[in-house]
Amino acid sequence: MKILFATLLVVTTPHLVTGQIHWGNLSKIGVVGTGSASYKVMTQSSHQTLVIKLMPNITAIDNCTKTEIEEYKRLLGTVLQPIKVALNAITKNIKPIRSSTTSRRHRRFAGVALAGAALGVATAAQITAGIALHQSMMNTQAIESLKASLETTNQAIEEIRQAGQEMILAVQGVQDYINNELVPAMGQLSCDIVGQKLGLKLLRYYTEILSLFGPSLRDPISAEISIQALSYALGGDINKILEKLGYSGSDLLAILESKGIKAKITYVDIESYFIVLSIAYPSLSEIKGVIIHALEGVSYNIGSQEWYTTVPRYVATQGYLISNFDDTPCAFTPEGTICSQNALYPMSPLLQECFRGSTRSCARTLVSGSIGNRFILSKGNLIANCASILCKCYTTGSIISQDPDKILTYIAADQCPIVEVDGVTIQVGSREYPDAVYLHKIDLGPPISLEKLDVGTNLGNAVTKLEKAKDLLDSSDLILETIKGASVTNTGHILVGAGLIAVVGILIVTCCCRKRSNDSKVSTVILNPGLKPDLTGTSKSYVRSL
Protein backbone atom coordinates (compact mmCIF):
# COMPACT_ATOMS: atom_id res chain seq x y z
CA MET A 1 0.00 0.00 0.00
CA LYS A 2 2.90 2.35 0.70
CA ILE A 3 4.30 1.57 -2.78
CA LEU A 4 0.89 2.28 -4.30
CA PHE A 5 0.67 5.63 -2.56
CA ALA A 6 4.23 6.51 -3.54
CA THR A 7 3.44 5.91 -7.22
CA LEU A 8 0.61 8.40 -6.84
CA LEU A 9 3.21 11.17 -6.99
CA VAL A 10 3.79 10.38 -10.66
CA VAL A 11 0.18 10.52 -11.78
CA THR A 12 -0.86 13.60 -9.83
CA THR A 13 -0.14 17.03 -11.20
CA PRO A 14 2.82 18.93 -9.73
CA HIS A 15 0.82 21.93 -8.56
CA LEU A 16 -1.08 19.76 -6.08
CA VAL A 17 1.99 19.26 -3.91
CA THR A 18 3.07 22.89 -3.75
CA GLY A 19 1.55 25.87 -2.04
CA GLN A 20 1.04 26.04 1.70
CA ILE A 21 3.72 23.48 2.60
CA HIS A 22 7.29 24.76 2.24
CA TRP A 23 8.91 21.63 0.85
CA GLY A 24 12.22 23.41 0.32
CA ASN A 25 12.78 24.22 3.99
CA LEU A 26 11.38 20.90 5.14
CA SER A 27 13.84 19.03 2.93
CA LYS A 28 16.70 20.77 4.76
CA ILE A 29 15.73 18.92 7.94
CA GLY A 30 15.05 15.63 6.18
CA VAL A 31 11.27 15.83 5.52
CA VAL A 32 10.05 15.19 1.97
CA GLY A 33 6.68 14.58 0.36
CA THR A 34 6.20 11.18 -1.26
CA GLY A 35 2.79 11.68 -2.84
CA SER A 36 -0.51 13.53 -2.89
CA ALA A 37 -4.08 12.54 -3.64
CA SER A 38 -7.65 13.77 -3.67
CA TYR A 39 -9.97 13.11 -0.73
CA LYS A 40 -13.25 11.18 -0.87
CA VAL A 41 -15.60 10.40 2.00
CA MET A 42 -18.28 7.73 2.15
CA THR A 43 -21.71 9.28 2.55
CA GLN A 44 -25.33 8.08 2.60
CA SER A 45 -25.62 4.44 1.69
CA SER A 46 -27.74 2.56 -0.81
CA HIS A 47 -29.29 -0.63 0.51
CA GLN A 48 -29.82 -4.06 -0.96
CA THR A 49 -31.93 -6.74 0.68
CA LEU A 50 -30.55 -10.25 0.55
CA VAL A 51 -32.50 -13.29 1.70
CA ILE A 52 -30.56 -16.44 2.44
CA LYS A 53 -32.83 -19.46 2.64
CA LEU A 54 -31.02 -22.12 4.59
CA MET A 55 -33.65 -24.84 4.12
CA PRO A 56 -34.35 -25.87 0.50
CA ASN A 57 -37.69 -27.04 -0.86
CA ILE A 58 -37.54 -30.84 -0.75
CA THR A 59 -41.13 -31.79 -1.58
CA ALA A 60 -40.07 -34.21 -4.30
CA ILE A 61 -37.66 -36.15 -2.07
CA ASP A 62 -39.31 -35.64 1.30
CA ASN A 63 -39.92 -39.35 1.94
CA CYS A 64 -36.20 -40.22 1.73
CA THR A 65 -34.64 -37.33 3.65
CA LYS A 66 -36.59 -36.90 6.89
CA THR A 67 -33.74 -37.96 9.19
CA GLU A 68 -31.18 -35.73 7.48
CA ILE A 69 -33.56 -32.78 7.41
CA GLU A 70 -34.33 -33.05 11.13
CA GLU A 71 -30.63 -33.15 11.99
CA TYR A 72 -29.99 -30.17 9.70
CA LYS A 73 -32.82 -28.18 11.33
CA ARG A 74 -31.36 -28.84 14.76
CA LEU A 75 -28.00 -27.55 13.52
CA LEU A 76 -29.59 -24.39 12.09
CA GLY A 77 -31.47 -23.73 15.30
CA THR A 78 -28.25 -23.48 17.30
CA VAL A 79 -27.14 -20.65 15.00
CA LEU A 80 -30.38 -18.78 14.35
CA GLN A 81 -31.98 -18.80 17.80
CA PRO A 82 -29.32 -16.59 19.51
CA ILE A 83 -29.50 -14.11 16.61
CA LYS A 84 -33.27 -13.85 16.92
CA VAL A 85 -33.02 -13.27 20.67
CA ALA A 86 -30.39 -10.55 20.12
CA LEU A 87 -32.49 -8.77 17.48
CA ASN A 88 -35.55 -8.81 19.73
CA ALA A 89 -33.54 -7.41 22.63
CA ILE A 90 -32.26 -4.56 20.47
CA THR A 91 -35.56 -3.55 18.90
CA LYS A 92 -38.11 -4.27 21.64
CA ASN A 93 -37.79 -0.76 23.14
CA ILE A 94 -38.14 1.05 19.80
CA LYS A 95 -41.65 1.95 18.71
CA PRO A 96 -43.03 3.88 15.73
CA ILE A 97 -44.25 7.45 16.25
CA ARG A 98 -47.47 8.55 14.61
CA SER A 99 -48.10 12.12 13.60
CA SER A 100 -50.07 14.24 16.07
CA THR A 101 -52.96 14.75 13.63
CA THR A 102 -56.19 13.46 15.19
CA SER A 103 -57.82 12.57 11.90
CA ARG A 104 -57.42 8.93 10.91
CA ARG A 105 -57.33 10.01 7.33
CA HIS A 106 -54.21 12.11 7.87
CA ARG A 107 -52.54 9.90 10.48
CA ARG A 108 -49.26 8.61 9.12
CA PHE A 109 -45.90 7.26 10.22
CA ALA A 110 -43.56 9.98 11.52
CA GLY A 111 -40.49 8.12 12.80
CA VAL A 112 -39.30 5.90 15.62
CA ALA A 113 -38.71 6.60 19.30
CA LEU A 114 -36.66 4.87 21.95
CA ALA A 115 -38.39 3.85 25.16
CA GLY A 116 -35.71 5.25 27.42
CA ALA A 117 -37.48 4.50 30.69
CA ALA A 118 -37.74 0.81 29.84
CA LEU A 119 -34.23 0.56 28.44
CA GLY A 120 -32.42 2.11 31.39
CA VAL A 121 -28.77 2.57 30.44
CA ALA A 122 -27.68 2.58 26.78
CA THR A 123 -24.76 4.06 24.92
CA ALA A 124 -25.10 6.29 21.87
CA ALA A 125 -23.83 3.48 19.63
CA GLN A 126 -26.43 1.04 20.97
CA ILE A 127 -29.25 3.55 20.49
CA THR A 128 -28.16 4.43 16.94
CA ALA A 129 -27.75 0.77 15.99
CA GLY A 130 -31.16 -0.13 17.35
CA ILE A 131 -32.98 2.66 15.51
CA ALA A 132 -31.11 1.94 12.25
CA LEU A 133 -32.03 -1.73 12.56
CA HIS A 134 -35.69 -0.91 13.18
CA GLN A 135 -35.82 1.38 10.15
CA SER A 136 -34.36 -1.29 7.86
CA MET A 137 -36.65 -4.07 9.07
CA MET A 138 -39.58 -5.19 6.97
CA ASN A 139 -43.08 -4.92 8.30
CA THR A 140 -45.19 -7.99 9.02
CA GLN A 141 -47.02 -7.88 5.69
CA ALA A 142 -43.76 -7.77 3.74
CA ILE A 143 -42.35 -10.69 5.75
CA GLU A 144 -45.42 -12.84 5.08
CA SER A 145 -45.28 -12.01 1.38
CA LEU A 146 -41.59 -12.86 1.27
CA LYS A 147 -42.17 -16.14 3.11
CA ALA A 148 -44.88 -17.16 0.66
CA SER A 149 -42.63 -16.40 -2.28
CA LEU A 150 -39.78 -18.45 -0.84
CA GLU A 151 -42.00 -21.44 -0.13
CA THR A 152 -43.28 -21.63 -3.68
CA THR A 153 -40.01 -21.09 -5.56
CA ASN A 154 -37.68 -23.84 -6.64
CA GLN A 155 -35.01 -21.53 -8.05
CA ALA A 156 -31.55 -21.27 -6.52
CA ILE A 157 -31.41 -17.50 -7.09
CA GLU A 158 -34.56 -15.50 -7.60
CA GLU A 159 -35.30 -11.79 -7.67
CA ILE A 160 -38.45 -10.93 -5.75
CA ARG A 161 -40.00 -7.52 -6.26
CA GLN A 162 -42.32 -6.13 -3.61
CA ALA A 163 -44.44 -3.03 -3.88
CA GLY A 164 -42.62 0.14 -2.87
CA GLN A 165 -39.33 -1.66 -2.30
CA GLU A 166 -36.23 -2.41 -4.28
CA MET A 167 -35.49 -5.81 -5.70
CA ILE A 168 -34.91 -8.55 -3.13
CA LEU A 169 -32.41 -11.23 -4.05
CA ALA A 170 -33.26 -14.65 -2.61
CA VAL A 171 -30.54 -17.28 -2.51
CA GLN A 172 -31.08 -21.00 -1.93
CA GLY A 173 -27.70 -22.60 -2.26
CA VAL A 174 -28.73 -26.30 -2.42
CA GLN A 175 -31.79 -25.95 -4.61
CA ASP A 176 -30.01 -26.44 -7.93
CA TYR A 177 -28.39 -29.62 -6.64
CA ILE A 178 -31.76 -30.98 -5.56
CA ASN A 179 -33.50 -29.99 -8.80
CA ASN A 180 -30.80 -31.09 -11.22
CA GLU A 181 -29.20 -34.12 -9.55
CA LEU A 182 -31.22 -35.69 -6.76
CA VAL A 183 -34.73 -35.48 -8.25
CA PRO A 184 -33.73 -36.99 -11.66
CA ALA A 185 -31.84 -39.78 -9.87
CA MET A 186 -34.70 -40.80 -7.57
CA GLY A 187 -35.58 -43.78 -9.73
CA GLN A 188 -32.01 -45.07 -9.81
CA LEU A 189 -30.87 -44.47 -6.20
CA SER A 190 -32.16 -45.87 -2.98
CA CYS A 191 -33.64 -43.62 -0.31
CA ASP A 192 -30.63 -44.12 1.93
CA ILE A 193 -28.22 -42.91 -0.73
CA VAL A 194 -30.42 -39.92 -1.59
CA GLY A 195 -30.60 -39.00 2.09
CA GLN A 196 -26.84 -39.31 2.53
CA LYS A 197 -26.14 -37.21 -0.55
CA LEU A 198 -28.53 -34.50 0.60
CA GLY A 199 -27.11 -34.58 4.13
CA LEU A 200 -23.56 -34.07 2.85
CA LYS A 201 -24.69 -31.28 0.54
CA LEU A 202 -26.57 -29.49 3.33
CA LEU A 203 -23.60 -29.77 5.66
CA ARG A 204 -21.36 -28.31 2.97
CA TYR A 205 -23.84 -25.50 2.37
CA TYR A 206 -23.99 -24.79 6.11
CA THR A 207 -20.19 -24.59 6.29
CA GLU A 208 -20.12 -22.30 3.26
CA ILE A 209 -22.66 -19.90 4.79
CA LEU A 210 -20.71 -19.79 8.05
CA SER A 211 -17.51 -19.02 6.15
CA LEU A 212 -19.00 -16.28 3.97
CA PHE A 213 -21.39 -14.63 6.41
CA GLY A 214 -19.67 -15.53 9.66
CA PRO A 215 -19.01 -11.86 10.62
CA SER A 216 -22.71 -11.04 10.16
CA LEU A 217 -23.78 -14.06 12.18
CA ARG A 218 -21.39 -13.12 15.00
CA ASP A 219 -22.22 -9.39 14.83
CA PRO A 220 -25.74 -9.07 13.39
CA ILE A 221 -25.80 -5.26 13.53
CA SER A 222 -22.68 -3.77 11.96
CA ALA A 223 -20.41 -6.45 10.51
CA GLU A 224 -18.37 -5.79 7.41
CA ILE A 225 -18.88 -8.01 4.39
CA SER A 226 -16.14 -9.79 2.46
CA ILE A 227 -15.67 -9.71 -1.29
CA GLN A 228 -16.61 -13.41 -1.42
CA ALA A 229 -19.87 -12.81 0.44
CA LEU A 230 -20.58 -9.79 -1.75
CA SER A 231 -20.05 -11.84 -4.89
CA TYR A 232 -22.31 -14.52 -3.44
CA ALA A 233 -24.97 -11.92 -2.69
CA LEU A 234 -24.82 -10.65 -6.27
CA GLY A 235 -25.10 -14.10 -7.79
CA GLY A 236 -21.45 -14.11 -8.81
CA ASP A 237 -21.76 -10.91 -10.90
CA ILE A 238 -19.76 -8.22 -9.10
CA ASN A 239 -20.29 -5.79 -11.99
CA LYS A 240 -23.90 -5.30 -10.91
CA ILE A 241 -22.92 -3.15 -7.96
CA LEU A 242 -20.38 -1.23 -10.05
CA GLU A 243 -23.04 -0.32 -12.59
CA LYS A 244 -25.70 0.45 -10.00
CA LEU A 245 -23.66 2.81 -7.80
CA GLY A 246 -21.17 4.14 -10.33
CA TYR A 247 -18.14 2.68 -8.58
CA SER A 248 -14.89 2.23 -10.37
CA GLY A 249 -12.94 -0.95 -9.74
CA SER A 250 -10.45 0.89 -7.52
CA ASP A 251 -13.31 2.58 -5.61
CA LEU A 252 -14.85 -0.77 -4.78
CA LEU A 253 -11.48 -2.16 -3.73
CA ALA A 254 -10.84 0.83 -1.47
CA ILE A 255 -14.33 0.59 0.04
CA LEU A 256 -13.80 -3.06 0.83
CA GLU A 257 -10.35 -2.37 2.29
CA SER A 258 -11.73 0.38 4.51
CA LYS A 259 -14.64 -1.90 5.52
CA GLY A 260 -17.17 0.52 4.13
CA ILE A 261 -19.75 -2.04 2.98
CA LYS A 262 -21.75 -3.23 5.97
CA ALA A 263 -24.26 -6.05 6.26
CA LYS A 264 -26.72 -6.35 9.12
CA ILE A 265 -29.25 -9.07 9.77
CA THR A 266 -32.72 -7.54 10.01
CA TYR A 267 -34.88 -10.63 10.35
CA VAL A 268 -34.53 -14.30 11.34
CA ASP A 269 -37.22 -16.90 10.76
CA ILE A 270 -36.61 -20.05 12.78
CA GLU A 271 -39.65 -21.83 11.29
CA SER A 272 -38.92 -21.39 7.61
CA TYR A 273 -35.17 -21.14 8.28
CA PHE A 274 -34.14 -18.03 6.41
CA ILE A 275 -32.39 -14.81 7.32
CA VAL A 276 -32.80 -11.34 5.81
CA LEU A 277 -29.73 -9.14 5.45
CA SER A 278 -29.61 -5.46 4.58
CA ILE A 279 -26.38 -4.64 2.75
CA ALA A 280 -25.35 -0.96 2.78
CA TYR A 281 -23.27 0.32 -0.13
CA PRO A 282 -21.91 3.81 0.62
CA SER A 283 -21.88 6.60 -1.93
CA LEU A 284 -18.62 8.47 -2.50
CA SER A 285 -18.37 12.24 -2.19
CA GLU A 286 -15.17 14.01 -3.17
CA ILE A 287 -14.26 16.96 -0.93
CA LYS A 288 -13.16 19.62 -3.37
CA GLY A 289 -9.94 21.46 -2.64
CA VAL A 290 -8.65 19.00 -0.03
CA ILE A 291 -5.34 17.34 -0.88
CA ILE A 292 -3.81 14.55 1.20
CA HIS A 293 0.00 14.57 1.36
CA ALA A 294 2.17 11.63 2.41
CA LEU A 295 5.41 12.48 4.25
CA GLU A 296 8.63 10.63 4.96
CA GLY A 297 11.61 11.69 7.05
CA VAL A 298 15.36 11.11 6.86
CA SER A 299 17.58 11.17 9.92
CA TYR A 300 20.43 13.68 10.16
CA ASN A 301 23.52 13.97 12.30
CA ILE A 302 24.59 16.73 14.70
CA GLY A 303 28.04 15.70 15.80
CA SER A 304 27.85 12.13 17.06
CA GLN A 305 24.08 12.25 17.68
CA GLU A 306 21.53 11.14 15.10
CA TRP A 307 18.22 13.00 14.98
CA TYR A 308 15.06 13.00 12.93
CA THR A 309 12.23 15.50 12.61
CA THR A 310 8.95 14.43 14.19
CA VAL A 311 6.11 15.05 11.73
CA PRO A 312 2.91 13.08 11.05
CA ARG A 313 2.82 10.55 8.22
CA TYR A 314 -0.03 12.37 6.47
CA VAL A 315 -1.31 15.94 6.39
CA ALA A 316 -4.14 17.61 4.50
CA THR A 317 -4.26 21.04 2.89
CA GLN A 318 -7.29 23.08 1.92
CA GLY A 319 -6.65 26.64 0.86
CA TYR A 320 -4.31 28.17 3.42
CA LEU A 321 -5.36 25.68 6.10
CA ILE A 322 -3.16 22.73 7.04
CA SER A 323 -4.83 19.89 8.98
CA ASN A 324 -3.86 16.59 10.53
CA PHE A 325 -5.07 13.45 8.78
CA ASP A 326 -5.91 10.12 10.40
CA ASP A 327 -5.33 7.34 7.88
CA THR A 328 -6.91 4.61 10.08
CA PRO A 329 -10.38 4.62 8.43
CA CYS A 330 -8.96 5.22 4.94
CA ALA A 331 -7.69 3.32 1.93
CA PHE A 332 -5.45 4.64 -0.84
CA THR A 333 -6.00 4.09 -4.55
CA PRO A 334 -4.37 5.57 -7.68
CA GLU A 335 -7.43 7.83 -8.05
CA GLY A 336 -7.43 9.18 -4.50
CA THR A 337 -7.94 8.58 -0.82
CA ILE A 338 -11.24 7.05 0.32
CA CYS A 339 -12.28 7.26 3.98
CA SER A 340 -15.25 5.74 5.76
CA GLN A 341 -15.57 8.92 7.86
CA ASN A 342 -14.11 12.40 8.07
CA ALA A 343 -10.42 11.91 8.87
CA LEU A 344 -9.39 15.58 9.19
CA TYR A 345 -8.74 17.16 12.58
CA PRO A 346 -7.10 20.44 13.66
CA MET A 347 -3.35 20.94 13.72
CA SER A 348 -1.56 23.03 16.33
CA PRO A 349 -0.39 26.49 15.20
CA LEU A 350 3.22 25.57 16.02
CA LEU A 351 3.15 22.53 13.74
CA GLN A 352 1.51 24.60 11.00
CA GLU A 353 4.41 27.06 11.25
CA CYS A 354 6.76 24.10 10.85
CA PHE A 355 5.07 23.01 7.62
CA ARG A 356 5.08 26.57 6.32
CA GLY A 357 8.87 26.67 6.52
CA SER A 358 9.79 27.70 10.08
CA THR A 359 12.28 24.94 10.87
CA ARG A 360 12.71 26.17 14.45
CA SER A 361 9.09 25.13 15.05
CA CYS A 362 9.75 21.52 13.98
CA ALA A 363 10.45 19.27 16.95
CA ARG A 364 13.19 16.64 16.69
CA THR A 365 14.02 13.49 18.58
CA LEU A 366 16.99 11.18 18.90
CA VAL A 367 17.07 8.08 16.70
CA SER A 368 16.52 4.97 18.81
CA GLY A 369 18.78 2.12 17.68
CA SER A 370 18.41 1.45 13.95
CA ILE A 371 14.92 2.95 13.67
CA GLY A 372 14.48 5.64 11.05
CA ASN A 373 15.19 6.20 7.37
CA ARG A 374 18.73 7.19 6.55
CA PHE A 375 18.15 7.83 2.85
CA ILE A 376 15.26 8.55 0.52
CA LEU A 377 14.83 9.23 -3.20
CA SER A 378 12.97 12.45 -3.98
CA LYS A 379 12.63 14.21 -7.35
CA GLY A 380 15.31 11.89 -8.70
CA ASN A 381 17.84 13.04 -6.09
CA LEU A 382 19.14 10.93 -3.25
CA ILE A 383 18.84 12.56 0.17
CA ALA A 384 21.10 10.62 2.52
CA ASN A 385 22.62 10.83 5.97
CA CYS A 386 26.07 9.73 4.87
CA ALA A 387 27.38 10.21 8.41
CA SER A 388 25.38 7.18 9.57
CA ILE A 389 25.51 4.94 6.49
CA LEU A 390 28.08 4.24 3.80
CA CYS A 391 27.54 6.31 0.65
CA LYS A 392 29.63 5.27 -2.35
CA CYS A 393 29.77 6.46 -5.93
CA TYR A 394 29.29 3.28 -7.94
CA THR A 395 30.56 4.95 -11.11
CA THR A 396 33.96 5.98 -9.73
CA GLY A 397 34.21 3.70 -6.72
CA SER A 398 34.96 6.62 -4.39
CA ILE A 399 33.39 7.13 -0.98
CA ILE A 400 31.01 10.08 -0.60
CA SER A 401 31.86 11.58 2.77
CA GLN A 402 29.78 14.02 4.78
CA ASP A 403 31.53 16.88 6.58
CA PRO A 404 30.76 17.33 10.29
CA ASP A 405 29.18 20.74 9.64
CA LYS A 406 26.67 19.23 7.18
CA ILE A 407 23.50 17.54 8.41
CA LEU A 408 22.50 15.88 5.10
CA THR A 409 23.98 15.10 1.69
CA TYR A 410 22.04 15.56 -1.57
CA ILE A 411 23.40 13.41 -4.40
CA ALA A 412 22.50 14.11 -8.04
CA ALA A 413 23.85 13.07 -11.44
CA ASP A 414 26.30 15.99 -11.58
CA GLN A 415 28.11 14.51 -8.58
CA CYS A 416 27.62 10.79 -9.21
CA PRO A 417 25.21 9.22 -11.75
CA ILE A 418 24.96 5.85 -9.96
CA VAL A 419 25.13 5.71 -6.18
CA GLU A 420 25.49 2.77 -3.84
CA VAL A 421 24.01 3.52 -0.43
CA ASP A 422 23.58 0.99 2.36
CA GLY A 423 24.01 -1.85 -0.13
CA VAL A 424 21.41 -0.49 -2.59
CA THR A 425 22.41 0.78 -6.04
CA ILE A 426 20.39 3.78 -7.27
CA GLN A 427 20.60 5.79 -10.48
CA VAL A 428 19.91 9.46 -9.74
CA GLY A 429 18.74 12.29 -11.97
CA SER A 430 19.60 15.93 -12.50
CA ARG A 431 19.98 18.16 -9.46
CA GLU A 432 16.80 19.40 -7.81
CA TYR A 433 18.17 20.11 -4.31
CA PRO A 434 21.22 22.07 -3.12
CA ASP A 435 24.51 20.24 -2.76
CA ALA A 436 24.41 20.19 1.05
CA VAL A 437 22.75 21.79 4.06
CA TYR A 438 25.07 23.32 6.65
CA LEU A 439 24.26 23.19 10.32
CA HIS A 440 24.99 26.86 11.01
CA LYS A 441 22.44 27.92 8.38
CA ILE A 442 19.53 25.98 9.92
CA ASP A 443 17.43 26.91 12.95
CA LEU A 444 16.63 23.54 14.49
CA GLY A 445 13.57 22.96 16.64
CA PRO A 446 13.42 21.82 20.27
CA PRO A 447 14.40 18.23 21.15
CA ILE A 448 11.65 15.98 22.50
CA SER A 449 11.33 12.33 23.59
CA LEU A 450 8.91 9.94 21.94
CA GLU A 451 9.97 6.62 23.45
CA LYS A 452 7.73 5.51 26.33
CA LEU A 453 10.68 4.85 28.61
CA ASP A 454 12.27 8.21 27.78
CA VAL A 455 8.99 10.04 28.28
CA GLY A 456 8.47 8.29 31.61
CA THR A 457 12.02 9.05 32.70
CA ASN A 458 11.70 12.70 31.71
CA LEU A 459 8.39 12.99 33.52
CA GLY A 460 9.94 11.41 36.60
CA ASN A 461 12.84 13.85 36.47
CA ALA A 462 10.45 16.75 36.02
CA VAL A 463 8.38 15.64 39.02
CA THR A 464 11.56 15.28 41.11
CA LYS A 465 12.71 18.75 40.12
CA LEU A 466 9.28 20.17 40.92
CA GLU A 467 9.37 18.55 44.36
CA LYS A 468 12.83 19.99 44.99
CA ALA A 469 11.67 23.40 43.81
CA LYS A 470 8.70 23.17 46.19
CA ASP A 471 11.02 22.34 49.10
CA LEU A 472 13.25 25.28 48.19
CA LEU A 473 10.24 27.58 47.99
CA ASP A 474 9.07 26.43 51.42
CA SER A 475 12.56 27.08 52.83
CA SER A 476 12.67 30.52 51.26
CA ASP A 477 9.26 31.32 52.77
CA LEU A 478 10.58 30.44 56.23
CA ILE A 479 13.65 32.61 55.69
CA LEU A 480 11.49 35.50 54.55
CA GLU A 481 9.28 35.15 57.62
CA THR A 482 12.36 35.15 59.89
CA ILE A 483 13.82 38.19 58.16
CA LYS A 484 10.49 39.98 58.41
CA GLY A 485 10.28 39.44 62.20
CA ALA A 486 13.93 40.41 62.71
CA SER A 487 13.55 43.54 60.61
CA VAL A 488 10.70 44.81 62.81
CA THR A 489 12.85 44.40 65.99
CA ASN A 490 15.88 46.01 64.37
CA THR A 491 13.80 48.97 63.24
CA GLY A 492 12.73 49.66 66.85
CA HIS A 493 16.32 49.53 68.06
CA ILE A 494 17.44 51.89 65.33
CA LEU A 495 14.74 54.42 66.20
CA VAL A 496 15.68 54.36 69.93
CA GLY A 497 19.36 54.77 69.09
CA ALA A 498 18.63 57.67 66.77
CA GLY A 499 16.61 59.38 69.50
CA LEU A 500 19.43 59.01 72.03
CA ILE A 501 21.95 60.34 69.55
CA ALA A 502 19.72 63.33 68.87
CA VAL A 503 19.41 64.14 72.62
CA VAL A 504 23.16 63.82 73.14
CA GLY A 505 23.76 66.05 70.15
CA ILE A 506 21.42 68.72 71.48
CA LEU A 507 23.16 68.66 74.89
CA ILE A 508 26.58 68.98 73.29
CA VAL A 509 25.48 71.92 71.17
CA THR A 510 23.99 73.66 74.21
CA CYS A 511 27.19 73.24 76.27
CA CYS A 512 29.33 74.55 73.43
CA CYS A 513 27.17 77.64 73.05
CA ARG A 514 27.40 78.47 76.77
CA LYS A 515 31.16 78.02 76.87
CA ARG A 516 31.66 80.33 73.90
CA SER A 517 29.49 82.97 75.55
CA ASN A 518 31.61 82.87 78.74
CA ASP A 519 34.86 83.08 76.82
CA SER A 520 33.76 86.24 75.00
CA LYS A 521 33.01 88.01 78.31
CA VAL A 522 36.37 87.17 79.87
CA SER A 523 38.37 88.32 76.82
CA THR A 524 36.86 91.88 76.85
CA VAL A 525 39.58 94.47 78.12
CA ILE A 526 38.47 97.60 80.05
CA LEU A 527 41.22 100.32 79.91
CA ASN A 528 41.92 102.48 83.10
CA PRO A 529 42.25 106.26 82.21
CA GLY A 530 44.54 107.05 85.25
CA LEU A 531 47.42 105.01 83.91
CA LYS A 532 49.64 106.19 81.12
CA PRO A 533 51.23 103.73 78.88
CA ASP A 534 54.95 103.39 78.31
CA LEU A 535 55.62 105.08 74.99
CA THR A 536 59.35 104.65 74.87
CA GLY A 537 60.55 103.95 71.38
CA THR A 538 57.18 104.77 69.83
CA SER A 539 57.05 106.99 66.84
CA LYS A 540 55.96 110.56 67.24
CA SER A 541 53.08 110.19 64.85
CA TYR A 542 51.67 107.34 66.81
CA VAL A 543 52.13 109.29 70.02
CA ARG A 544 50.50 112.35 68.53
CA SER A 545 47.57 110.24 67.49
CA LEU A 546 47.25 109.00 70.99
UniProtKB/Swiss-Prot annotation:
Answer whether the UniProt record assigns the keyword Transport to this protein: no
Coiled-coil spans are: 134-162, 458-483
Show the disulfide pairing. 330-339, 354-362, 386-391, 393-416
User: What InterPro entries does this protein map onto?
Assistant: Fusion_F0_Paramyxovir
Q: How is it modified after translation?
A: The inactive precursor F0 is glycosylated and proteolytically cleaved into F1 and F2 to be functionally active. The cleavage is mediated by cellular proteases during the transport and maturation of the polypeptide.
List residue numbers at the site (Cleavage): 108-109
Q: Which cellular component terms (GO) are annotated to the entry?
A: host cell plasma membrane; membrane; viral envelope; virion membrane
Cytoplasmic topology ranges? 513-546
Q: Which UniProt keywords apply?
A: Cleavage on pair of basic residues, Coiled coil, Disulfide bond, Fusion of virus membrane with host cell membrane, Fusion of virus membrane with host membrane, Glycoprotein, Host cell membrane, Host membrane, Membrane, Signal, Transmembrane, Transmembrane helix, Viral envelope protein, Viral penetration into host cytoplasm, Virion, Virus entry into host cell
Transmembrane segments annotated in the record for this chain: 492-512
Carbohydrate-modified residues: 25, 57, 63
**Renumbered residue ranges of the record's region Fusion peptide:** 109-133
Q: Which residues lie on this side of the membrane: Extracellular?
A: 20-491
Q: What span is annotated as the signal peptide, if there is one?
A: 1-19
Q: Which GO terms describe its biological process?
A: fusion of virus membrane with host plasma membrane; symbiont entry into host cell
Mode of membrane association: Single-pass type I membrane protein; Single-pass membrane protein
Predominant location category = virion
- Where in or outside the cell is it found? Virion membrane; Host cell membrane
Q: What is the annotated role of this protein in its UniProt record?
A: Class I viral fusion protein. Under the current model, the protein has at least 3 conformational states: pre-fusion native state, pre-hairpin intermediate state, and post-fusion hairpin state. During viral and plasma cell membrane fusion, the heptad repeat (HR) regions assume a trimer-of-hairpins structure, positioning the fusion peptide in close proximity to the C-terminal region of the ectodomain. The formation of this structure appears to drive apposition and subsequent fusion of viral and plasma cell membranes.
Q: How does it assemble?
A: Homotrimer of disulfide-linked F1-F2.
Family listed: Belongs to the paramyxoviruses fusion glycoprotein family.
* Name of the molecule in the record: Fusion glycoprotein F0
Specify the species: Rinderpest virus (strain Kabete O) (RDV)
In the record, what lineage is assigned to the organism producing the protein?
Answer: Viruses, Riboviria, Orthornavirae, Negarnaviricota, Haploviricotina
Q: Which gene encodes it?
A: F
